[in-house]
C-alpha cells in the first residue's frame, strides 16, 4: 500500500496552521482579514453564509488567490491574511495549507467551520451569494423601462 490516508494528510496540514475559532475569525475579519467561503452552492443554499465573506468555491481557490496566477483576484497578495471556511472545518484546513504552499503564509482556517460560527451566535445570512466568478460574469440588471 502506498500513499497516506486523508486523516494523515489533514493532520499534517493542521500542524502548519494556527486555526482560529469563530470569535477570533470575526475579529480578524473586522481588522481586514479576507474571510473566504469555499463551500459548494448546495451547502450555502441549505445552511446560509457569513456576511462579508468572499465566496470562492474550492475547485478554483488557488487560481484566484495565487498572486502569480493570470486568473487571480485583485485582492491576491502574498501578505494577505486569509481565513478559509467550509461547513465543519476539514476541507478548509486542506485549502488553507494549499494556500500556504503557494506562499500565502498568513492563510489559516475557521476551526469548526460554518457550523461553529453559527453555534457561536455570530451573524449569518440565508441568501445564496454568487461566487467571485459568477459575480464577475453576471451582467448588471437592465434598467427599469
Give the label of every model feature segment:
Residues 1-34, 41-81, 90-145:
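Rhodanese-like catalytic fold shared by cysteine-dependent sulfurtransferases
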Residues 85-86:
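Short, surface-exposed ligand- or partner-binding patches at beta-edge/loop junctions that are enriched
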Amino acid at each position: 500500500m502506498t500513499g497516506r490516508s486523508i486523516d494523515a494528510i489533514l493532520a499534517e496540514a493542521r500542524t502548519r496552521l494556527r486555526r482560529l475559532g469563530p470569535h477570533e475569525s470575526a475579529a480578524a475579519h473586522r481588522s481586514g482579514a479576507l474571510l473566504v467561503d469555499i463551500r459548494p452552492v448546495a451547502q450555502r443554499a441549505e445552511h446560509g453564509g457569513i456576511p462579508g465573506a468572499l465566496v470562492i468555491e474550492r475547485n478554483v481557490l488557488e487560481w484566484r488567490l495565487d498572486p502569480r496566477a493570470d486568473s487571480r483576484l485583485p485582492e491576491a497578495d502574498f501578505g494577505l491574511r486569509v481565513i478559509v471556511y467550509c461547513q465543519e472545518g476539514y476541507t478548509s484546513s486542506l485549502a488553507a495549507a494549499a494556500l500556504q504552499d503557494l506562499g500565502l503564509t498568513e492563510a489559516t482556517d475557521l476551526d469548526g467551520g460554518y457550523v461553529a460560527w453559527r453555534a457561536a451566535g455570530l451573524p449569518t445570512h440565508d441568501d445564496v451569494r454568487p461566487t467571485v466568478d459568477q459575480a464577475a460574469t453576471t451582467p448588471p440588471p437592465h434598467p427599469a423601462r
